[in-house]
């Protein structure tokens, strides 16, 4: 039966659905739920366990047996980690769920439920919508915490790559003194050794959030059967996303404009291959060069820039520790190619600009050039007449 949990439904005779929080990758849903067995806990635990978040993932037809098993293994791996800046996981239920809905018991097969702590604070997205951007000191404080928890995930033998880092998945505690990282709905658990790289989650689908996705997600390779598949994810997936988040925390927007046409997601993702990240100092005067360089090194996926890109989060943390030192730009302004520099050319060839507007622009420039030509010719004729007389 398809996943269709509603407000008031009781899952596993234990959790009452309060509301749908969000929908994520791999047919996953986040629900806020109340714990019906909270009386089993002591007074100090009741506050933590009264309200919980349920992450429910149901298998789809696109996921074969092997990939579903890999996903389950990867889920178990990701839920065994513990860090003060990770949303805590209390339980995992699979492969089926029992749901009491409108006095009828429904069993959901091939379904996983992850029971997580509820963080009673705003998301980074909500804070950005409210504040616009953060002070430099606030950014360094919160961003360092975020990088440290990503470094922790990357340090496992079963290397955990989050793959969907974005402001919506970063939560603040209620007093705004700390952050919690949420949502491993599309995380990849990767085993790396000398012989091979094995990915424990399905890599054939393009998962993530476009504005925070590195162009590397589009790269593919050919397997032993001659089938083209996506390359295994690397830590640079998360590092690129971190750079975009740092940029957004400082200036309130992402580095590259999202394509108007939702069908052109790949075009948006590829922009980091074609353009350099804009200088934040042009948008805000107090951004230090050190943070400009950190953003640049996180997002340096252009071929000529790749030599500067971080190979791991340890390098990023080392640079963050030195953010107050005087620095010069790694790549000078005059060597950077920015998205807006080709704006007029893009407008002229854009499918979004109606033909009559494109024609109007061409006519305008033709008239201007003709007027300039007439002016120059007239000047020489008049000058020639005066000199001759």
From Swiss-Prot:
What keywords tag this UniProt record? ATP-binding, Kinase, Nucleotide-binding, Serine/threonine-protein kinase, Transferase
Task: Please indicate if the UniProt record lists Flavoprotein as a keyword.
Answer: no
Superkingdom to which the source organism belongs: Bacteria
| Keyword set includes Nucleotide-binding | yes
Q: Which residues form the active site?
A: 164 (proton acceptor)
Q: EC annotation?
A: 2.7.11.1
**Catalytic reaction(s) noted:** L-seryl-[protein] + ATP = O-phospho-L-seryl-[protein] + ADP + H(+); L-threonyl-[protein] + ATP = O-phospho-L-threonyl-[protein] + ADP + H(+)
Recall the GO molecular function terms of this protein's record. Answer: ATP binding; protein serine kinase activity; protein serine/threonine kinase activity
Domain Protein kinase, by residue range, is 15-356
Q: Which InterPro entries match?
A: Kinase-like_dom_sf, Prot_kinase_dom, Ser/Thr_kinase_AS
Q: Which family does it belong to?
A: Belongs to the protein kinase superfamily. Ser/Thr protein kinase family.
Protein name, as recorded: Putative serine/threonine-protein kinase
Q: What is the lineage of its organism?
A: Bacteria, Bacillati, Mycoplasmatota, Mycoplasmoidales, Mycoplasmoidaceae
């Amino acid at each position: 039966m398809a996943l269709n949990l509603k407000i008031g439904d009781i899952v596993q005779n234990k959790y009452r659905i309060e509301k749908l929080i969000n929908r994520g990758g791999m047919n996953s849903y986040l629900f806020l739920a109340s714990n019906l067995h909270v009386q089993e806990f002591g007074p100090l635990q009741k506050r933590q366990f009264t309200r919980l978040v349920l992450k429910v993932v149901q298998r789809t037809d696109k996921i074969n047996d092997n990939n579903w098993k890999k996903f389950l293994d990867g889920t178990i791996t990701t839920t065994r980690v513990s860090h003060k800046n990770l949303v805590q996981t209390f339980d995992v239920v699979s492969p089926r769920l029992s749901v009491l809905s409108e006095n009828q018991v429904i069993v959901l097969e091939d379904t996983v439920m992850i029971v997580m702590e509820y963080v009673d604070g705003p998301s980074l997205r909500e804070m950005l919508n409210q504040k616009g951007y953060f002070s430099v000191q606030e950014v360094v404080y919160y961003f360092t915490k975020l990088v440290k928890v990503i470094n922790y995930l990357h340090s496992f033998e079963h290397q955990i790559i989050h793959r969907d880092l974005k402001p919506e998945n970063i939560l603040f505690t209620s007093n705004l003194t700390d952050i919690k990282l949420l949502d491993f709905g599309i995380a990849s658990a990767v085993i790396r050794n000398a012989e091979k790289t094995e990915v424990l989650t399905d890599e054939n689908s393009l998962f993530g959030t476009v504005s925070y996705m590195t162009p590397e997600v589009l790269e593919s390779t050919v397997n032993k059967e001659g089938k083209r598949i996506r390359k295994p994810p690397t830590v640079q997936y998360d590092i690129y996303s971190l750079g975009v988040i740092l940029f957004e925390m400082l200036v309130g927007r992402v580095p590259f404009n999202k394509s108007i046409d939702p069908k052109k997601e790949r075009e948006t993702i590829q922009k980091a291959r074609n353009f350099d990240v804009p200088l934040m100092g042009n948008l805000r005067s107090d951004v230090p060069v050190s943070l400009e360089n950190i953003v640049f090194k996180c997002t340096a996926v252009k071929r000529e820039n790749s030599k500067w890109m971080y190979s791991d989060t340890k390098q990023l943390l080392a640079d963050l520790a030195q953010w107050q030192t005087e620095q010069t730009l790694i790549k000078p302004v005059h060597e950077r190619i920015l998205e807006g520099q080709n704006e007029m050319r893009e407008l002229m060839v854009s499918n979004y600009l109606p033909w009559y507007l494109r024609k109007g622009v061409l006519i305008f420039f033709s008239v201007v050039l003709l007027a300039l030509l007439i002016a120059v010719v007239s000047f020489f004729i008049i000058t020639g007449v005066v000199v001759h007389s």
